[in-house]
Amino acid sequence: NCIDFGGDCDGEKDDCQCCXRNGYCSCYNLFGYLKRGCKXEVG
């Protein structure tokens, strides 16, 4: 299940890598444990 760069991701998987190399899921951490606003980005 590919996620394009800029697309939403769950913060747990490296799905962003399968559309282009060195992709990763970047999130904002709220209160140190809640992940929000996760997006696939270029590593």
Swiss-Prot record:
Pfam families: Toxin_34
InterPro entries: Omega-agatoxin_II/III_CS (IPR005853), Toxin_34 (IPR013605)
Subcellular location: Secreted
Cystine residue pairs: C2-C19, C9-C25, C27-C38
GO CC annotation terms, alphabetical: extracellular region; host cell presynaptic membrane
Statement: the UniProt record of this protein carries the keyword Transmembrane: no
Tissues showing expression: Expressed by the venom gland.
Record GO terms (molecular function): calcium channel regulator activity; toxin activity
Keywords in alphabetical order: Calcium channel impairing toxin, Disulfide bond, Ion channel impairing toxin, Knottin, Neurotoxin, Presynaptic neurotoxin, Secreted, Toxin, Voltage-gated calcium channel impairing toxin
Function as written in the Swiss-Prot or TrEMBL entry: Omega-agatoxins are antagonists of voltage-gated calcium channels (Cav).
Domain comment as written in the entry: The presence of a 'disulfide through disulfide knot' structurally defines this protein as a knottin.
Family of the protein in this entry: Belongs to the neurotoxin 04 (omega-agtx) family. 03 (type II/III omega-agtx) subfamily.
Protein name: Omega-agatoxin-Aa3c
Protein species of origin: Agelenopsis aperta
Taxonomic placement: Eukaryota, Metazoa, Ecdysozoa, Arthropoda, Chelicerata
